[in-house]
A protein has these predicted regions:
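N-terminal presequence-like segments and the immediate start of the first folded domain
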Residues: 5, 9, 14, 20-97, ...
Length: 154
């Protein structure tokens, strides 16, 4: 235990160091989830393209196999879909704080990185990022990009 005792029916937490302090009710701490989507976007399964809750935005992995067969084209297409979803959420790419890039072949990293680099070029603070080879991706995609952003309007 972390030195705290919380009783689920009480509005107080007891700590060893400070005694009781008030905790807002759950309804005041948790906002409803809101779906984010772009009309006409193709989905590759039973999921929501994006979700907003508690000042955060989570976008599902974006792929664009229609953009072409090479990694650069698919990266540009996935990033364009991310831009559209962020716009639907009422923010810009500057709100992105983390990106995860999945590649079907890590040998295509540099090709993806050139397109991604151009996308983040204008950002004052570039998102934290992870990139790795995931093997086979949905619909034969070469690249899939997942992002998390801050709801700057919250």
């Amino acid at each position: 235990m972390c030195g705290m005792i919380y009783h689920p029916t009480s509005r107080h937490v007891l700590t060893k160091a400070t005694g009781y302090f008030d905790v807002p009710p759950v309804s005041a701490r948790v906002m409803a989830k809101k779906a984010i989507s772009v009309p006409g976007s193709k989905l590759y399964g039973p999921y929501t393209p994006g979700v907003m809750a508690n000042g955060m935005i989570w976008l599902s992995g974006q792929i664009d196999v229609e953009a072409g067969g090479d990694t650069a084209s698919q990266t540009a297409g996935a990033l364009a879909k991310i831009d559209a979803l962020l716009e639907a959420a009422g923010v810009t790419k500057d709100a992105v704080c983390f990106a995860q890039v999945l590649l079907d072949d890590i040998g295509d990293f540099q090709e993806m990185n050139e397109v991604y680099g151009a996308w983040v070029e204008s950002m004052e603070i570039k998102p934290a990022r992870a990139a790795f080879e995931a093997g086979a991706l949905p619909a034969g995609a070469k690249v899939e990009i997942v992002v998390q952003a801050i709801d700057t309007n919250h």
